[in-house]
Amino acid sequence: MAPIKEFISKFSDFKNNKKLILSSAAIALLLLASIVGIAATTTNQNKNQKITTLSSTSHAILKSVCSSTLYPELCFSAVAATGGKELTSQKEVIEASLNLTTKAVKHNYFAVKKLIAKRKGLTPREVTALHDCLETIDETLDELHVAVEDLHQYPKQKSLRKHADDLKTLISSAITNQGTCLDGFSYDDADRKVRKALLKGQVHVEHMCSNALAMIKNMTETDIANFELRDKSSTFTNNNNRKLKEVTGDLDSDGWPKWLSVGDRRLLQGSTIKADATVADDGSGDFTTVAAAVAAAPEKSNKRFVIHIKAGVYRENVEVTKKKTNIMFLGDGRGKTIITGSRNVVDGSTTFHSATVAAVGERFLARDITFQNTAGPSKHQAVALRVGSDFSAFYQCDMFAYQDTLYVHSNRQFFVKCHITGTVDFIFGNAAAVLQDCDINARRPNSGQKNMVTAQGRSDPNQNTGIVIQNCRIGGTSDLLAVKGTFPTYLGRPWKEYSRTVIMQSDISDVIRPEGWHEWSGSFALDTLTYREYLNRGGGAGTANRVKWKGYKVITSDTEAQPFTAGQFIGGGGWLASTGFPFSLSL
C-alpha cells in the first residue's frame, strides 16, 4: 500500500505544478510516452484479464466472507489489493486479513518508536504512554502470530469450540490493545496532540482486527452448528459425551487437563506447595524483592515456577511480563503478605502503568496475597492489580485501592474468594473475567464522587469478553455504610460501547441504589451494552426500579444464564482444575 500512496503523491505533485512549460521537446516526449503507454496498456489488459479469470471465484468468496464484518469495504479492499493466490475458502480470507493486519501493526510499532526518538517536548506521562503502546503493540503481534498458527491447524488440532474460544480470545485481546494504547493519551490537551498522531494507524488496526474477529465468529459458529446437525444421528450417550467434552475440555482419565505436566499434577495433589524461590524482606529468603524473584524465573516455561513471598510489606511495582509464563505467587495470607505501591494518574502515570502488580505472562496464579495501591481518592486512577494473563487465577487475595482497583485488562481470568475494594470503576477492563464467592465492597470516595463497582470495556460486539460476578457479596465498607445516603453507589457504568456485565446468584446490599446502574455520559452505549441480573438477593437486589435501558435485562431462566458460567464463558473446564483452586463450572 505504501508504494501506491507514494506514486499517487508524486503524480499529484506533478499535476499541480502550474509552472510546467511544454516545450517542443516535452511534447515529443509525451508523444513517445503515449506510444509506449498504448503498448503497456495492451500488455496490462492481458495481465488484468488473467487476474480477473483467476480471481472471479476469489471475488465472490471475498465479497461473501466480508459481508459478515462491521467494516465490509475495508475487509474487501484490503485483501483484494494484495492480489496473490486465488482464495478458495473463508479460512484463507481470514488468514490473508490477519497477515495484512500484522503488517499494519508493525508499521504502528515503528511509528511509535519514531515519536519517542524524534518528537520534542514530550511530557513524562506521554513517554510512559508511548511505551505502553509499544508493549500492547508487541503483545498484539504475538496474538496475531498465534492466531495464524491456530488457524493453520483449524479444525483438526482440538475441538471446534476450543478452536473458536482461543481464536476469539486472541483477536478480542488484540482489539483491546489498540484502545489501551490510545487511552494513555486522554488525560489533558497535550496528551491528545500525541494521540492524534497515532489515531489513524491504531484505528485502522482495530478495524482490521474487528473484521477478522467477525469472520472467525461466523466461520466457527457455522462449523459448530453443522457439526451438531450431523451429530444428531449419533446416540444420546455420544451426544452427551461430546457436549461434556466441550464444557470440560480435553481431560485425561484422572480428570486433569492433558496439557498439564506430571510435575504440576504432583504439585497440585500435594498438601503443601514447594517453592522454587523465596522472597523475604528480612533477607532470610533467596530474594528481598518480588521483582528480583520474577526476573530470575525462567522464560516461556511449561512448568509451574512457584515464588513464595513471606509475610511482610513489599513496597515495589512488579511486572510479570509475557515471557514469564506459569508463574505462581504464594503468600503467607491476605493482610500478611502485602505488595503495595502508589503510582497514579495525577502524579504523571498512565492508568495502565499505575498498577502495583501487572500479570501478563500466561497461566499466572496468585493466592494468599494482598495487592494494594495507596494513592488515595484524590489521585484518580491508581491500579492495585492489572491482569492480562490468559488462563490466570487468583485465590484468597485482596485488591485494595480507590479508583480503578482491579484492571481485568484482557484474556481469560478467574477470581475466587477474593476481596476487592474501591470507589470509582474499581473493577474494570475488557477481559473475559469470572468472579466467584468474592467480597466486593465500595468504600467512601471523595466529596461529590459516585461509586461504580464495574466499568466493563467491551468495544466490539463480537468480542467474547465481559465481567461475570457469580455467588458474590456486593456491599460497602464501614466508612461508606455510615454515610451511604451521601455517596450513591451503583453496580456499574458502560466504559465502552458494548460493555457487558452479568451479576447472578449474588447478595447485593442496600448500599446499591434502586436503579442499579449509571450512565457513562448521556445516552452513550445505553442501547448497545449488555447488563444482566439473575437470581440475586439482598436489600439492593430488587429489579422493579432498575434502569429502563434497551441494553439492560433481567435473566429469567437457567438456560439464558448458563453461557455466563465459568464452564462456558471462560472455558473453565479445560484449565481451572490445574490451578488447584476451588471453582464452580455451572450455576
From Swiss-Prot:
PROSITE patterns xref list: PECTINESTERASE_1, PECTINESTERASE_2
SUPFAM superfamilies in alphabetical order: Pectin lyase-like, Plant invertase/pectin methylesterase inhibitor
GO CC annotations on file: extracellular region; plant-type cell wall
Annotated catalysed reactions: [(1->4)-alpha-D-galacturonosyl methyl ester](n) + n H2O = [(1->4)-alpha-D-galacturonosyl](n) + n methanol + n H(+)
Principal subcellular localization: secreted
Signal sequence extent: 1-40
Tissues in which the protein is found: Expressed in flower buds.
Record keywords: Aspartyl esterase, Cell wall, Cell wall biogenesis/degradation, Disulfide bond, Glycoprotein, Hydrolase, Secreted, Signal
Biological pathway: Glycan metabolism; pectin degradation; 2-dehydro-3-deoxy-D-gluconate from pectin: step 1/5
Residue pairs linked by disulfide bridges in the UniProt entry: 418-438
Binding, substrate: 351, 381, 493, 495
Enzyme class, spelled out: hydrolase
EC number: 3.1.1.11
More info: The PMEI region may act as an autoinhibitory domain and prevent untimely PME activity during transport.
Function: Acts in the modification of cell walls via demethylesterification of cell wall pectin.
PANTHER family according to UniProt: PECTINESTERASE
Protein name: Pectinesterase 2
Source organism: Arabidopsis thaliana
Taxonomic path: Eukaryota, Viridiplantae, Streptophyta, Embryophyta, Tracheophyta
